[in-house]
Amino acid sequence: MIDFGNFYSLIAKNHLSHWLETLPAQIANWQREQQHGLFKQWSNAVEFLPEIKPYRLDLLHSVTAESEEPLSTGQIKRIETLMRNLMPWRKGPFSLYGVNIDTEWRSDWKWDRVLPHLSDLTGRTILDVGCGSGYHMWRMIGAGAHLAVGIDPTQLFLCQFEAVRKLLGNDQRAHLLPLGIEQLPALKAFDTVFSMGVLYHRRSPLEHLWQLKDQLVNEGELVLETLVIDGDENTVLVPGDRYAQMRNVYFIPSALALKNWLKKCGFVDIRVVDVCVTTTEEQRRTEWMVTESLSDFLDPHDPSKTVEGYPAPKRAVLIARKP
């Protein structure tokens, strides 16, 4: 059983303490009602991992943990087998005591694009919405954040996060809660809020932006990364049944339209800091994610389009401030 008690104890002593009015009951309800058919298998994999304190831990340039003396072949194989029980691994990569988890996404590339444009994360309390396996939270900690809290309702991601945390010496500077943004009260408590790869999955994107704003302190910073298309401030793509084989894609605005959405929600100092086409080097099938990936979702005769005929995935990073 994954224990959230450490997180409750942590926030009881800081400015997130008012969250304890609702959070424990929500988690207790989740524990009663959840259980994906494979959840027991996943949580067992976490439980059976060895407890290791890293001799060398690098979260600034990567997510890498090393022991003082190399682990035995048997120990490495045990870790690898248990981590493979948590496949597919989508966000990473991770290098843990000789086990290199080559994930579907090179999330480090995204972090390298985002990091230069952020306000200094030193000492900050951060919320990462739709955090996946938690890769970027560890990089936030590496960049100096005091506390990174991730929310993602996907149970596999929770187990992947807890597995990595255990191999990082049970590091308590990052925590993942199996909740969606709509389940959070208006905490107004985070210095920086990240929403990366979430907005296009929301039926009401402006409501999502308001929800993000409700989590920020005054003068807090929003980091928004999402799919965009080319066009002016009035351009928005509303895909049909699927976009790049994904059913749950609702609105893909231009970067200029997205700036207007943020302005409408009351954000200021809005900047588009990066726009890039997603490549099949950044998102691809690997030994740790063996099903279809980006190359399968693009037109084989024209990779500038998806198999449905829409523009191929292009992503923008916008940064804005809550006044």
Swiss-Prot record:
First-tier enzyme category under EC: transferase
GO molecular function annotation: transferase activity, transferring alkyl or aryl (other than methyl) groups
CDD domains per UniProt: AdoMet_MTases
GO biological process: tRNA wobble uridine modification
Alphabetized Gene3D superfamilies for the sequence: Vaccinia Virus protein VP39
EC number: 2.5.1.-
Catalysed reaction, written as an equation: carboxy-S-adenosyl-L-methionine + 5-hydroxyuridine(34) in tRNA = 5-carboxymethoxyuridine(34) in tRNA + S-adenosyl-L-homocysteine + H(+)
HAMAP family (alphabetical): tRNA_carboxymethyltr_CmoB
Function in brief: Catalyzes carboxymethyl transfer from carboxy-S-adenosyl-L-methionine (Cx-SAM) to 5-hydroxyuridine (ho5U) to form 5-carboxymethoxyuridine (cmo5U) at position 34 in tRNAs.
Name of the protein described by the UniProt record: tRNA U34 carboxymethyltransferase
Lineage: Bacteria, Pseudomonadati, Pseudomonadota, Gammaproteobacteria, Enterobacterales
